[in-house]
UniProtKB/Swiss-Prot annotation:
Pfam families: Flavin_Reduct, Flavodoxin_1, ODP. PROSITE patterns: FLAVODOXIN, FLAVODOXIN_LIKE. GO terms for molecular function: electron transfer activity; FMN binding; oxidoreductase activity, acting on the CH-NH group of donors, NAD or NADP as acceptor. Mediates electron transfer from NADH to oxygen, reducing it to water. This modular protein has 3 redox cofactors, in other organisms the same activity requires 2 or 3 proteins. Its EC number is 1.-.-.-. Residues 279-417 form the Flavodoxin-like domain. This is Putative diflavin flavoprotein A 4. SUPFAM superfamilies: Flavoproteins, FMN-binding split barrel, Metallo-hydrolase/oxidoreductase. Binds 2 iron ions per subunit. The keyword Electron transport applies.
């Protein structure tokens, strides 16, 4: 059953950016997709309005779903631009007085207008949403607070006749209130922003899915590439489900290419971490303007082949920011200005950045403001004083960014990626040695530059790991190293002829070092090796898989020198594990620090 359609579109068979759909009136397309289940597709044929950084211009649909069993549920009503059309069409299929539930996969100012009208007309309906969404709704509609029903992940909503909605909270930096639903009766996953496509046409389903490939990838890159970690978490939740269909928030429903698109999402997520360069994009947004700028910058970075991890400071934990900073090659911080200041979350994040990010990482600053923009100046000056280099000039946008402003953001993201590549090539060139004629062991020895490493030993089956930065090459034939360690720790058991150990040289930007200390691991304490991938050498000591290089060593001699023991060891074997990596170096401000 399909309700009247406002006309046929022009061909949509090319994914080219230059192809436009016909400019037809907006309409609502209704069809039954499963027993007791309908889709209402609000169709926009020309330029996409509500995601202004999305410039493909092939129109879109805003998909809403109606399940009519013993109880009735309406999933994801559209935004304000379709409110009147939608509320005129919906009563043809449903008496609003009998509507039991409205499920909101996410909320935003655009959708609030339609939700308000529905709540006024459907007087007994409960609004189902995540906890972050409920906070926004209660602030917007305080007089309806008792009608908002918050859910936790894996909560069930039984509609009768076999329709049981399994609700899954899926927060992302872009949609902190994200919620998906799975109907066990119809085996349909209502996926909201996942698996969608911004294309408008007459096809309800994806019969011509091969022709959607370019649009699907473009949609993923624009909306999800900067948040692949969260997308993979969502996919993990979906894995146990038996699916006949995916019902996204935009574009054709996925039935004919179900396994292919699901597999594509896995592959696209995995492609991001495999990029050689990674940027941490850290922001907070009061009214959505700074978030829009962040998405445009991320789009420029992704197009330039750089992996992006977006961190929404309003929902991120401090340890997430620390890990993102340690793992990235460059970082970009965005902030609104509220009362002449940066939000508290950004001030906290900036403190973490200044204490965690090495000076070799490239930096960027952007933000929106109403009148003065002091927050942007604050962040920029703090980073300048900290000695960081910038990948682009600070971007300042007053009020909401228009298309020209977003183009500046996208271009700045691409420029940042180019600067990052140049910056990294220069660093590699400074470190490079003549390695082509050297064997693997000599290459590994060549990585020693007063570098940070983890010494691993083993005694009677117990493995030990100690962080050190006092190491240098001591001989060429045979290759040997000199290692200084505090004497009060009995040389960590290294003061013994032919004592075996492994020196794991660490890679800059990785977080391995936070698992170790300059003191031996306590006997009954937490064992970091249980959390780190590793394997044993022939001498029984451990190699850390994330190390830049490793050296298998034998102690030849040692001397007590002041408050330290100086150990000389010969290198028996070694290998560079990350040929393109950079050696992590300890920068000290005082010679009295270990």
């Amino acid at each position: 059953m399909i309700s009247p359609i406002g006309g046929l579109s022009q061909a949509l068979h090319s994914p080219s950016d230059s192809i436009f759909v016909a400019s037809l009136p907006r309409d609502i397309q209704v069809a039954e997709i499963a027993p007791q289940t309908k889709v209402l597709r609000s169709r926009l044929w020309d330029r996409l309005k509500f995601e202004v950084e999305y410039g493909r211009r092939r129109g879109t649909t805003s998909n809403s779903y109606l399940i009519q069993a013993d109880h009735t549920a309406l999933i994801d009503p559209p935004g304000e631009s379709f409110c009147d059309l939608y509320l005129a069409e919906l009563p043809k299929y449903l008496d609003l007085a009998q509507l039991d539930y409205i499920v909101a996969s996410h909320v935003n100012p655009n959708r609030m207008v339609t939700l308000e009208q529905l709540l006024r007309r459907a007087t007994k309906a409960k609004l189902i949403c995540s906890r972050p969404a409920a906070k926004v709704l209660k602030a917007t509609f305080p007089h309806w607070e008792e009608r908002f029903q918050t859910v936790r992940s894996q909560d069930m909503l039984d509609l009768g006749r076999g329709h049981k909605l399994q609700l899954m909270t899926l927060p992302t930096p872009r949609w902190p209130d994200g919620l998906c639903a799975y109907d066990a009766g119809s085996q349909i996953l209502f996926s909201d922003k996942l698996f969608g496509t911004h294309v408008c046409g007459d096809a309800i389903f994806d019969e011509d899915w091969r022709q959607l490939g370019g649009d699907r990838r473009f949609y993923f890159d624009c909306l999800h590439a900067p948040q692949t970690r969260q997308v993979e978490t969502a996919l993990d939740q979906f894995d146990p489900l038996t699916l006949k269909m995916i019902a996204p928030g935009h574009g054709p429903l996925v039935r004919f290419s179900l396994s292919r698109l699901y597999s594509d999402y896995r592959q696209w997520c995995q492609q991001q971490p495999s990029q050689t360069l990674k940027v941490a994009l850290i922001y907070a947004s009061a009214y959505g303007n700074t978030a829009t700028m962040a998405r445009a910058i991320a789009q420029g970075l992704v197009k330039a082949g750089v992996a992006v991890e977006t961190i929404n400071c309003e929902i991120a934990e401090p340890n997430e920011i620390v890990e993102a900073i340690q793992a990235c090659d460059g970082f970009i911080v965005g902030s609104p200005t509220l009362g002449s200041h940066a939000p508290v979350q950004i001030q906290t994040a900036l403190g973490i950045v200044l204490s965690s990010a090495t000076k070799t990482k490239l930096a960027g600053v952007f933000g929106s403001y109403g009148w003065s923009g002091e927050a942007i100046d604050l962040i920029e000056n703090k980073l300048k004083d900290g000695g960081y280099r910038f990948g682009f000039e600070a971007i300042r946008i007053q009020f909401s960014p228009n298309l020209d402003a977003l183009d500046v953001c996208t271009t700045s993201g691409a420029n940042f990626a180019r600067q990052l590549r140049t910056h990294k090539r220069q660093r590699i060139a400074r470190q490079a040695t003549t390695e082509t004629q050297a064997d693997r062991t000599q290459q590994a020895v060549g990585r020693i530059i007063g570098s940070i490493g983890v010494v691993t030993t083993q005694t009677t089956g117990r493995h030990q790991g100690i962080l050190t930065s006092w190491v240098s090459q001591a001989s060429f034939t045979p290759p040997g190293i000199m290692l200084a360690i505090p004497g009060e720790f009995d040389a960590y058991g290294l003061a013994g002829q032919n004592k075996a150990f492994v020196l794991n040289l660490l890679q800059e930007g990785r977080s391995v070092r936070r698992h170790f200390d300059h003191q031996p691991l306590p006997k009954d304490g937490d064992n970091p090796f249980s959390r780190l991938e590793h394997y044993s050498t022939q001498n029984g000591c451990l190699i850390l898989a994330e190390a830049l290089a490793y050296l298998e060593c034998l102690v030849q001699s040692w001397s007590n020198i002041g408050d330290h023991v100086l150990v000389y060891a010969t290198v028996q074997a070694g290998q560079v594990l990350q040929p393109n990596g950079i050696t992590a170096i300890r920068h000290r401000k005082s010679g009295g620090q270990y």
